[in-house]
Swiss-Prot record:
Coiled-coil stretches noted in the UniProt entry, renumbered to this chain: none
Species, as recorded: Bacillus subtilis (strain 168)
InterPro entries registered for this protein in UniProt: Aldolase_TIM, GlpP
GO terms of biological process kind: cellular response to glucose stimulus; glycerol metabolic process; negative regulation of termination of DNA-templated transcription; positive regulation of DNA-templated transcription; response to antibiotic; transcription antitermination
GO molecular function, one term: RNA binding
Null mutant phenotype: Defective in glycerol 3-phosphate uptake. Noninducible for glpK and glpD. Is able to grow at concentrations of the antibiotic fosfomycin that is not tolerated by the wild-type.
The keyword Acetylation belongs to this UniProt entry's keyword annotation: no
Protein name, as recorded: Glycerol uptake operon antiterminator regulatory protein
Length: 192
């Protein structure tokens, strides 16, 4: 089973308490979700001091426009390891700036999936984050159709949810559930 930098879990950080937990963990990659632009650079620098690599969910940053210009600023000035977005122009900018480009894909219905597949074919993100991440058959289908590594996220509540997503072909699962972080952090330290 393939994983993302030997991490089956990508901690998704929603607040400073979770950020502190992440800094004190053995994970090397995490995702910043809700944050204000004024805090972002300091959070990224603090993570880097601890040897951590942060991916930023651009669509959830307050205080910046969620377009290619905002993405360019984040890539050049903030310098995260990667950018997550539902917007294909933001993904294109991340690819141009040579950081991880993660296309977030909400699976609402067949037509939404088909439209997303067109964008993905055009922009070729490095990863696709599939939401909700609890539908193994869709994870498998998107992986087969695109050949692009998949992150599964959304409604990941139990170990079983994580395992099913990984078995379906996801390289990692994004979750803000700190109990799952701890469980899979133990997995990380056992496999060293």
């Amino acid at each position: 089973m393939m994983s993302f930098h030997n991490q089956p879990i990508l901690p998704a950080i929603r607040n400073m308490k979770q950020f502190d937990e992440f800094l004190n963990s053995s994970f090397s990659y995490g995702v910043i979700l809700d944050i204000h632009l004024g805090q972002l650079k300091g959070v990224i620098k603090e993570a880097q001091k601890h040897g951590k690599n942060m991916m930023v969910h651009v669509d959830l940053i307050q205080g910046i426009k969620h377009d290619e210009y905002g993405a360019e600023f984040i890539c050049q000035d903030i310098k995260p390891a990667g950018i997550i977005s539902t917007r294909s122009n933001v993904i294109a900018k991340a690819k141009q700036k040579k950081i991880y480009a993660i296309q977030r894909l909400f699976l609402l219905d067949t037509s939404a999936m088909e439209k997303s597949m067109e964008f993905i074919g055009k922009h070729k993100p490095d990863f696709i984050e599939v939401l909700p991440g609890i539908v193994p058959s869709l994870i498998q289908e998107i992986k087969e159709k695109t050949g692009i590594p998949i992150f599964a996220g959304g409604f990941i509540r139990t170990e079983e949810d994580v395992e099913q997503a990984l078995k379906a072909g996801a390289v990692a699962v994004t979750t803000s559930n700190t109990k799952l972080w701890k469980k899979y952090e133990n997995f990380l330290t056992e496999s060293d």
